[in-house]
Amino acid sequence: MSDLLGILKQQGQSEEFDAIKIALASPELIRSWSYGEVKKPETINYRTFKPERDGLFCAKTFGPVKDYECLCGKYKRLKHRGVICEKCGVELALAKVRRERMGHIELASPVAHIWFLKSLPSRIGLLLDMTLRDIERVLYFEAFVVVDPGMTELERGQLLNDEAYLDAMEQYGDEFDARMGAEAIRDLLRQIDLEDEIRNLREELPTTNSETKIKKITKRLKLLEAFYESGNKPEWMIMDVLPVLPPDLRPLVPLDGGRFATSDLNDLYRRVINRNNRLKRLLDLNAPDIIVRNEKRMLQESVDALLDNGRRGRAITGTNKRPLKSLADMIKGKQGRFRQNLLGKRVDYSGRSVIVVGPTLKLHQCGLPKKMALELFKPFIFSKLEFRGLATTIKAAKKMVEREESVVWDILDDVIREHPILLNRAPTLHRLGIQAFEPVLIEGKAIQLHPLVCTAYNADFDGDQMAVHVPLTLEAQLEARSLMMSTNNILSPASGEPIIVPSQDVVLGLYYLTREKVNALGEGKIYSSAQEAQNFYEAGHLDIHAKIKIRMPKEDGETGYHLVETTVGRAILAEILPKGMPFDYINRTMTKKVISKVIDSCYRKFGLKETVIFADQLMYTGFKYATRSGASIGIEDMEIPDDKASIIEHADNEVREIESQFRSGLVTNGERYNKVIDIWSRTNELVAKSMMSKIATEEVADAKGNKVRQESFNPIFMMADSGARGSAAQIRQLAGMRGLMAAPDGSIIETPITANFREGLNVFQYFISTHGARKGLADTALKTANSGYLTRRLVDVAQDVVITEDDCGTDTGILMQPLIEGGDIVEPLHERVLGRVVASDVYIPTQTEPVVKAGTLLDEEWVEKLEKHGVDQVMVRSPITCQTRFGLCAKCYGRDLARGHLVNTGEAVGIIAAQSIGEPGTQLTMRTFHIGGAASRATAANNIQIKTKGVIRLHNIKTVTHENKNLVAVSRSGEVTIVDEFGRERERYKVPYGAVISAQDNSPVEAGQVIATWDPHTHPVISEVSGRLKFVDLIDGITMNRQTDELTGLSNIVIIDAKQRSAAGRDLRPMVKLVTDEGDDIYLAGTNVPAQYYLPVDAIVNFEDRSLVGIGDVIARIPQERSKTRDITGGLPRVADLFEARKPKDSAVMAEVSGLVNFGKETKGKRRLIINVSEDQCHEELIPKWRHISVFEGEHVERGEIIAEGALNPHDILRLLGVGALANYIVNEVQDVYRLQGVKINDKHIEVIVRQMLRKRVITFAGDSKFLVGEQVEESAMLQENDKLLAEGKQIARGTPILLGITKASLATESFISAASFQETTRVLTEAAVSGKVDELRGLKENVMVGRLIPAGTGYTYHQSRKAKRARVAAGGDSSATHTVTASDVEHALSEALNADNHEH
């Protein structure tokens, strides 16, 4: 029997391949694939259902329909295997050969492959140096092309229309050869001598000067070299023979009622065959030229449609007006081959069900319904039944299981013990969306989930479903247990903070348990142990909140005991603390933040096991006391503050006051609106404050009968205060006032909702509430998709970043400083550098020895040391500066956040980075509607008040001194910082244009001092010199209006919008100049620039013509726009823009060189700014006049300094300031968005993505390399080429880094398989085929698609050993070492075993 099995074994290809190459197929190759020609368009006989001979389903060509059975039925059964029936010509084989055998169609006339013709840039066009339109005219028989000019004056490749052709024929006769159609193009392609062309172009390159020509030549050169090196022949882009897909991949399925469902490909093939046969007949008949031509054109069109329907002209539609799905459509898009079948497959041994909460489970368990378990573990049960001799055959075992005999349940218990299963909840946004658990069999039909893992899954129990998967092999079970078990995933890979943190009820229970109450039963008593106190409480002699004293063992390694003041509840909690954990960790009121910290420090001090047990105990305790507390929401608990009415009345009066000011013309409508919004924002804060103080505290009598205040036990307050549920903002809406609402366009409606939910809303208030509520829901739906797409792009760009070595040996890194915004340190240095490796020694001024040596991994202890020594900047290693060629090194990455130690080799840090950034995106986008659209707008800031004592430093601020000795800022990007006595920066503030600064540079300041003030509602225009005002182009009624105030009689001048002016005033540019009394221009100090200020629309001028103005006076003010609400809506697109490296609109102009500024001659709409580097070297910028230029004449600027205000362009930052500055910029900007939402992500994830955006180089100097100047190449490719050149002693190539957006970077990866499965499949494959690309299968995606272990994690070692083995073979080592067990050996062994069994029976 073993021989038989050996014969049966399909002669499959060997599994061992290391790369995949894509190339053009030559006609010979296509014929060699084919098992026969398809000559007829018939498919199957509608009566017999047998395939027609020579048709599209022909059994002779493609193989038998049934296993080992020929069509006419002469030969049947296995014994005739391989026989070819002489009657019907069918070879006897397995029916599945119909999935792999191809046919071909011999075309009567060659046709062009549409991908190489129409996929831009057109490859055929580039090779022939003709435009796409011209080639199409030839191919679709509208014009002749000269193939061989002979001795005539015509040129090769010249197009001739019919008349020109006839004229030429008359003139030259047979001297020349001009034809039309694909044959002509094929002959032209054949004539190209690649070597010659390449040589000529290479010689031509240095001599040309025009940019466009150089671009064109390099494009052609690259294509020609690609053809030359890959061995592809240009004429193969024109096809003489068309391959036919195996029939089982384009099936024809009979439906009931005699109709057939067919794949669209069959229709497309039929059209091709019909037209081809008709063309053959016409050619045999010597039909007139015009008819043949038309038929050839139709053949070309039908082949186009088969390959890529709809690429040219209108798509061919089927019977139901739907475009037919062509071969190209089969592979692209979400439903295409790549994404549907290769990257994601359905798996066996899986099930799904609704989840319910399992509060009694341990952290590593989940409840699995018996019914599901029985089905999922069937094969294991069968084998166990046989093994124990309870069933003789598999069939018998099956019957036993179906009958659910009692012994089956015992065996199921046995099988399930210690066999982990995987639980997954869609959407799986990060790796914690799939975790392993040990199943516990339960009755019922719902899966039970442990409450602590809900955060990771983002699961709730309102009907969520989860899927179960069974790891089958031993290796899979091992991995599930050691890597994926929920107990091994306590920390979040995104931030390194615990993700197994109690939430909601548990938090509420622990909070209630650890609260203090004044004058509770048993206050002031002393107990010998926590256990004793607990006993007294259980007996009812103690209140759980009573303040008592307990004798506790001393901590920090000291022996003996001491008395601790605590409460009964905290003593109860102390019982579950791990041994050695200090009691003062929990001797406080436990809020969610505190609990998270406790779990974190437990993990760092006592390790995994203790933490898991502790977390479980916390949960049980929390649930128990949440139940005991009886905390619930009652309408009485929403206490409305008594002074609410008076606060609101006061606000109404203020608003009335402003309305009257507006009516009398003192303020503009915009200012009025802004001030009203401000009043209501402030009022809302006041009501909220008053309400919180009422809800948060209560007055009680203490033991002596005195009145004291304590934190209240109001359940709503407790829920918010503990962090269990709800926030101050929500309580404010329940018991304060709902406040301002946003209109559908995002602007704020100026009438707020003064009612709260307890009082109830009236119809008008309800109506304006609906805007925000609906917007929230609509946003959610739209943005979930956007966020998912962002994650997909991130994963794609970073998928092949794997830790490949321990240390790349670089000594560069990036400089880390604390992040300071305003008066707050947003992220202290110790948080930013935790888990990083130091790049260079860290010193402090007082010591000569370094505090930290280079190469140290900074853990908690080290960062405490840094903090203690007051270090405020550290150079750390970063993924961006890592020198590893493929992947990253462990030292540059630092700590594995989810494990807390240096990252292992093989860790797929790219995917983790992408998930960490993408996952909160979805969270954030889903989070818009929770506050119900209430507009949260901070009251506009109007001053800088500092918080710490220190010295003030001004940065980038241009100031002028007002006559009252104050400084007035006249620059936009200025900042002030406060520095402490060690010279460390403590606070940092932006200073707006027009701010009055009341402290001098480098002067000492006290805490609480106000150092700058400004008007938040207007942009001022400040005079920088003193003199008389002169109006230019300010004409009453044309460019400006006068508004007189009735009360004061003062008049203001307001500029009119250019769009609303009469024709006369369209082109006028209103501005004010400062002149001397004689009327001469006054220049800005130290420059030759006149002091003149253009006035934008709506500007209000405060002075009259010819009035005197002092330095620092406000000449005009521009009311600010209505403020829109900030929502993550701005956030997610912002993150996408940063990662896509989009150029911002009106981006800032940065100085290209360092030097002195002066202004040259102005053009019509622009100013010329010249930066002089030296006598003979300068750089010019043309800047539109409306842009605000932030440098003066004669000022010195550094390279990369901002000259004209605007959003920064990341490409400029990279070019002018380098990689470090760019990394800093992107990291900080992305973090700003997430921080606004309170999401923590570690910087290194963003850095990994930035590294991938920077992996290309633009060649600046080609040396002796194969690269061309201006070409974009992978850095690794450039370095490899340089290594080769160095070895040969030649000149190396040099390049500068270039920033690509994530989409572009994904499409530009080395691996064409990965790029094609991402986006623009056609373009990627066309390009790859032409250049004969080889995919080395380095990334994760490529390996998933060829069905291999990924080269990361546990698969990393497998790939390494394969590589090592290959190297040994290549080195001519021990050949026997290469002999590994192949599939056939295994089958052979199996058949032997089966035979042995047979003999025994």
Curated annotation (Swiss-Prot):
Where Zn(2+) 1 binds, per the record, is at C70, C72, C85, C88
Q: Which InterPro entries match?
A: DNA-dir_RpoC_beta_prime, DNA-dir_RpoC_beta_prime_bact, RNA_pol_asu, RNA_pol_N, RNA_pol_Rpb1_1, RNA_pol_Rpb1_3, RNA_pol_Rpb1_3_sf, RNA_pol_Rpb1_4
Query: Reaction(s) catalyzed by this protein?
Result: RNA(n) + a ribonucleoside 5'-triphosphate = RNA(n+1) + diphosphate
Superkingdom of origin organism: Bacteria
Enzyme Commission number: 2.7.7.6
- Family matches, as Gene3D superfamilies: 1.10.132.30, 1.10.150.390, 1.10.1790.20, 1.10.40.90, 2.40.40.20, 2.40.50.100, RNA polymerase II, clamp domain, RNA polymerase Rpb1, domain 3
Molecular function (GO) terms for this protein are: DNA binding; DNA-directed RNA polymerase activity; magnesium ion binding; zinc ion binding
Q: Keyword set for this entry? A: DNA-directed RNA polymerase, Magnesium, Metal-binding, Nucleotidyltransferase, Transcription, Transferase, Zinc
Which cofactors are required for activity? Answer: Mg(2+); Zn(2+)
Give the record's cofactor note, including how many are bound. Answer: Binds 1 Mg(2+) ion per subunit.
User: Binding of Mg(2+): at which residues?
Assistant: D460, D462, D464
Task: Kindly state the subunit structure of this protein.
Answer: The RNAP catalytic core consists of 2 alpha, 1 beta, 1 beta' and 1 omega subunit. When a sigma factor is associated with the core the holoenzyme is formed, which can initiate transcription.
Question: NCBIfam families this protein is in?
Answer: rpoC_TIGR
PANTHER family with a match to the protein in the record: DNA-DIRECTED RNA POLYMERASE, DNA-DIRECTED RNA POLYMERASE SUBUNIT BETA
Q: Which family does the record assign?
A: Belongs to the RNA polymerase beta' chain family.
Functional description taken from the UniProt entry:
DNA-dependent RNA polymerase catalyzes the transcription of DNA into RNA using the four ribonucleoside triphosphates as substrates.
Database matches in HAMAP family = RNApol_bact_RpoC (MF_01322)
State what protein this is by name. Answer: DNA-directed RNA polymerase subunit beta'
Q: Which organism is it from?
A: Legionella pneumophila (strain Lens)
